[in-house]
């Protein structure tokens, strides 16, 4: 009798665990495999096996022998690395100030950050052209008072737009990590004589470093995948 009841309990547990959301997850994984994994796998396979069907590195030799491709790859990597560094340097202090101090307009800042993340790349880049382009509003306004600014077109413009567009990812991730931070660690460091910036450097940042690295990776990959901004401003 006891064995029968325990078997029935296990069956109910299995049915409970393999419920609606389990089916949803399986369906999503299948769709991801069909529409994401399969195309990339096929593309990767065909890069080594051209139309003839024999193994060859000719595609890679052609890519790395063309100066045009190498310059584009180098510039893309440079933009992504610089954007990641600047976005991290802006996002972390903003997140710390926002979570540790009761500043005026905190909700407005958070709302503006979230809204900036929702705008498509083309819209964001075009907005900056309207502001800082050759005939941009801010450009013309500064020219009237005798101030000339550099062109937004080119490397510096792409870096500016990418940084201001993507640092909110770091801000949001780090803000969440700091809100969930165990305050007893900071209190313990204070009692041991670790104060101010030294406490941030040796206590706070090491604890939230996985979050910072995750946010930096998202910034890097997003800037690498963004084609609209370089096309308009580059």
Question: Language-model segments: which ranges?
Answer:
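Hydrophobic positions on the alpha-helical face of helix-turn-helix-like DNA-binding modules
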Residues: 188-189, 199, 203
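Membrane-water interface segments at the C-terminal ends of transmembrane alpha-helices
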Residues: 19-51, 65-179, 205-228
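Short coil/turn motifs that cap or connect alpha-helices
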Residues: 104, 194-195
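Hydrophobic alpha-helical membrane segments of integral membrane proteins
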Residues: 230-233
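A short amphipathic helical element positioned immediately N-terminal to and/or at the very start
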Residues: 11, 56-64
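Helix-turn-helix DNA-binding elements, focusing on the entry/boundary residues of the two helices
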Residues: 185
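Transmembrane alpha-helical segments of polytopic membrane transport and secretion proteins
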Residues: 1-28
């Amino acid at each position: 009798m006891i064995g029968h009841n325990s078997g029935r309990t296990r069956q109910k547990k299995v049915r409970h665990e393999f419920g609606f959301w389990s089916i949803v997850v399986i369906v999503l994984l299948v769709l991801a495999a069909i529409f994401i994994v399969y195309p990339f796998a096929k593309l990767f396979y065909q890069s080594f096996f051209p139309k003839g069907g024999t193994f060859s590195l000719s595609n890679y030799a052609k890519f790395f022998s063309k100066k045009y491709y190498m310059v584009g790859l180098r510039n893309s990597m440079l933009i992504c690395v610089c954007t990641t560094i600047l976005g991290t340097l802006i996002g972390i202090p903003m997140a710390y100030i926002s979570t540790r101090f009761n500043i005026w307009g905190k909700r407005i800042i958070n709302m503006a950050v979230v809204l900036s993340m929702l705008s498509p790349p083309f819209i964001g880049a075009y907005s900056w052209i309207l502001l800082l382009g050759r005939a941009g509003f801010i450009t013309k306004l500064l020219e009237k008072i005798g101030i000339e600014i550099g062109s937004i077109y080119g490397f510096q413009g792409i870096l500016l737009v990418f940084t201001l567009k993507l640092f909110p990812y770091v801000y949001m991730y780090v803000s969440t990590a700091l809100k969930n931070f165990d305050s007893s660690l900071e209190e313990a460091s204070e009692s041991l004589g670790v104060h101010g910036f030294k406490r941030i450097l040796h206590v706070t940042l090491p604890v939230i470093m996985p979050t910072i690295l995750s946010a930096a990776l998202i910034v890097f990959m997003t800037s690498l995948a963004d084609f609209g901004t370089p096309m308009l401003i580059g």
